[in-house]
């Protein structure tokens, strides 16, 4: 019988912004954001909690963020600095387990099931890791401890910033009952809206539906919803996980009727993609750009082109070519990059959204 797993999700608190406040103490307690220049149509990569009180968030156009908060202090992205901090923290994590799955520069999963550190207590391991990060780097981290990855990630967000939460195996069934479905992995605003139309707001509501019904209603996502609503997630922590692509997509409440409508929403998708690439840190270089369109008859097409950089003009061309394949209203539009599968890593130069 396999032992009950002990999974920790470590999530640095507003990582880039926290580094800026540490390195420039005069910024403490002031609303700051890290991102591109508003004059060049840049986007916010991240911001501190003081800025979030004004409604500022990652992937927001910098110009809009400055309208929300005129006192906002904008800091340029110092990716080399953030990468060095991330490497230091990751080396610290390896003292506790070899089973580490980094998700980005500022978060990672750890499987400490077999760890003998801190008397084998996942709670104590998480506390010690967070304390050591603060003592050595003057940065705070939040942590979630649970029997699986999805619950650990939910828990790490529960007492942010600079806190942690434990979901014990015997508490899982009770914990998920009142959990809003929007907290589940893969449930974004559109899926939350679809579930809400069925009066599904919590996992308890979701548990009332059979897996057959959920599969019929939501396809393969239905199986995932069925399991997550019961606190089930058997995905292993995968140290060998290699990111092959970075993408964003949106399902629209009203179909996009033509290619012009698709092009009109491209700037927002581009801003989100740029922010996601920035958060990924060093990547192995861009190999392809691609566009995905799902039409209102649920048929899907993907079109890509070999490119070594993010290029707005090429993405526009791909959208037009993809739309022409069926010429029907579009319900989902996505854009992304495929990465070179090499051992040499680099920072990608982004176009700063000169739209």
Curated annotation (Swiss-Prot):
UniProt EC number: 2.7.7.7
Cofactor note: Binds 2 magnesium ions per subunit.
Active site positions, chain numbering: 107
Subcellular location: Cytoplasm
Record's keyword annotation contains Transferase: yes
Gene3D superfamilies: 3.30.70.270, 3.40.1170.60, 5' to 3' exonuclease, C-terminal subdomain (1.10.150.20), DNA polymerase, Y-family, little finger domain (3.30.1490.100)
Alphabetized GO MF terms: damaged DNA binding; DNA-directed DNA polymerase activity; magnesium ion binding
Catalytic activity of the protein: DNA(n) + a 2'-deoxyribonucleoside 5'-triphosphate = DNA(n+1) + diphosphate
Site residues (Substrate discrimination), renumbered to this chain: 16
Domain called UmuC: residue spans: 7-188
Protein residues bound to Mg(2+): 11, 106
Top-level division of the source organism's lineage: Bacteria
Gene Ontology process terms (BP): DNA-templated DNA replication; error-prone translesion synthesis; SOS response
Enzyme class: transferase
Pfam families: IMS, IMS_C, IMS_HHH_1
One Gene Ontology term, aspect cellular component: cytosol
Cofactor(s) demanded: Mg(2+)
Matching InterPro entries: DNA/RNA_pol_sf, DNA_pol_Y-fam_lit_finger_sf, DNA_pol_Y-fam_little_finger, DNA_polymerase-Y, DNApol_IV, IMS_HHH_1, Rev_trsase/Diguanyl_cyclase, UmuC
Keywords, in A-Z order: Cytoplasm, DNA damage, DNA repair, DNA replication, DNA-binding, DNA-directed DNA polymerase, Magnesium, Metal-binding, Mutator protein, Nucleotidyltransferase, Transferase
NCBIfam families: PRK02406.1
Subunit (UniProt): Monomer.
Record's function text: Poorly processive, error-prone DNA polymerase involved in untargeted mutagenesis. Copies undamaged DNA at stalled replication forks, which arise in vivo from mismatched or misaligned primer ends. These misaligned primers can be extended by PolIV. Exhibits no 3'-5' exonuclease (proofreading) activity. May be involved in translesional synthesis, in conjunction with the beta clamp from PolIII.
Similarity comment: family membership: Belongs to the DNA polymerase type-Y family.
Protein's name in the database: DNA polymerase IV
Organism field: Legionella pneumophila (strain Corby)
Gene name per UniProt: dinB
